[in-house]
Amino acid sequence: MKLALFDLDGTLLDGDTDELWCEFLIEAGVLDRADFEARNRSVVVRYRAGTITPAEFCAFYASTLAGRSRQGWAVLRERFVATAIVPRIGAAARALVAQHRDADDRILLTTATNCFLTEPIAAGLGIAEPDLIATELEEAGGVFTGANAGVLNMREGKVTRLASWLEMNGLAGTAIAEATFYSDSANDLPLLRAVGRAVAVDPDARLRREAGQSGWPILELPR
């Protein structure tokens, strides 16, 4: 069994889950436009440029969930996934996942986006919850505090979290050398460099340059 690792945002999804969630909550009147709209744009721009820290990136989006429980967010999350996410995961992306499933590979979704938002997205792709590696959220008394927990699953954190996942699942660290990882972003270069087969999917400019220099295949997915 080999591992097939997929980034979510910009790779399988035509868009960014965190950015879309923030926009969705602003339009729904849950978040104040004056407080969040410009900050959302700024965080996305800095993420793409590679100039924002994982702590700042993840903290901003965790803050959008503060003050409610999982149940308190359930209806909005369901509507968000149905209207903003499902239409943005195209047939080509789903076929790519299916190709690895047909090859009996174990499919993992590894994303900087938090676990609460990505659990139903992974399920919709047929990826079991134990095979989702996402940024964790802090809860107190069953309510999201607006902070993160554990190692953030972004940049070098993706390598750390994958190593922990391998250990928890009784798999040797050498499994990374046989794994395939699909990503669109230079933010994922630490994990792309760690796996045996890196594939750049609709890559940003920095990743496109790296892929060319490293001989990695570049995949343009019809959206």
Task: Write out the residue ranges for each language-model feature.
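N-terminal alpha-helical segment
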Residues: 36-40, 57, 175
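Acidic/polar active-site rim loop that often engages polyanionic ligands
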Residues: 18-21, 57-58, 140-147
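Metal-dependent phosphoesterase signature
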Residues: 56-92
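Active-site neighborhood of HAD-like aspartate-dependent phosphohydrolases
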Residues: 1-49
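Amphipathic alpha-helical segments within well-ordered protein domains
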Residues: 22-23, 62, 196
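Electropositive phosphate-/nucleotide-binding environments in soluble metabolic enzymes
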Residues: 15, 37, 51, 55, ...
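C-terminal cap/substrate-recognition subdomain and adjoining C-terminal extension
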Residues: 1, 75, 82-223
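Short, compositionally biased "basic patch" segments
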Residues: 44-71, 132-137
